[in-house]
A protein has these predicted regions:
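A nucleotide- and high-energy phosphate-metabolite-utilizing enzyme signature
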Residues: 1-177
Length: 177
């Protein structure tokens, strides 16, 4: 409770906004080097969803106590209910988060270690695809379906994350004045 006023400020200055934008740019630059095969740190991955959600917590958590939650999915639900982000974006991020976490968990179970990267080996990719329910008879079709879904999910996250400081999602200028 003592740190709440420092984390969830009732008023934000432009310096905080600039700092958040700098972090977003740094994440984007680092992700450009990462492959889409990394479901956590790659472009459109879990980290981008978490950063997106945490940015809204930082910006609006001071005035909206319902956003002061630890879970990404719970905060997404509150952002949807508070109409701070479009329902469609909240739905996309929620589905993507669940899908990417499932992929991540299957990767970690298969590798028996903490990993977030899908192997470039087709046999290993197919094994993950089958574990996730991509059960087409032909290996190539199952793998193609899984990789297509993965690209679509991560592309949807990326599109929303890229628009974080656009008028599509926030009237940030109004929030800090």
């Amino acid at each position: 409770n003592m740190i709440t006023p420092f984390v969830f400020r009732s008023l934000l200055d432009e310096g905080v906004l600039r700092d958040v934008e700098k972090v977003k740019k740094r994440i984007e630059e680092e992700h450009l080097r990462a492959s889409f095969l990394n479901v956590k740190l790659g472009i459109g991955g879990i980290r981008e969803i978490e950063f997106f959600v945490q940015t809204f917590q930082l910006l609006y958590g001071g005035g909206n106590k319902q956003l002061r939650l630890a879970g990404t999915l719970q905060v997404l639900q509150q952002l949807r209910q508070s109409e701070l982000i479009p329902k469609q974006d909240a739905d996309t991020l929620e589905k993507a988060y669940l899908f990417l976490r499932r992929v991540e968990h299957h990767l970690q179970l298969r590798e028996e270690q903490q990993t977030h990267t899908l192997a470039s080996n087709i046999v290993q990719q197919y094994a993950i695809a089958r574990n996730l329910g991509y059960l087409e008879f032909e290996i190539e079709k199952a793998l193609q379906h899984f990789l297509s879904d993965l690209k679509d999910v991560m592309g949807g996250v990326r599109a929303i994350f890229s628009g974080l400081f656009s008028s599509k999602h926030l009237e940030i200028e109004a929030a800090i004045h």
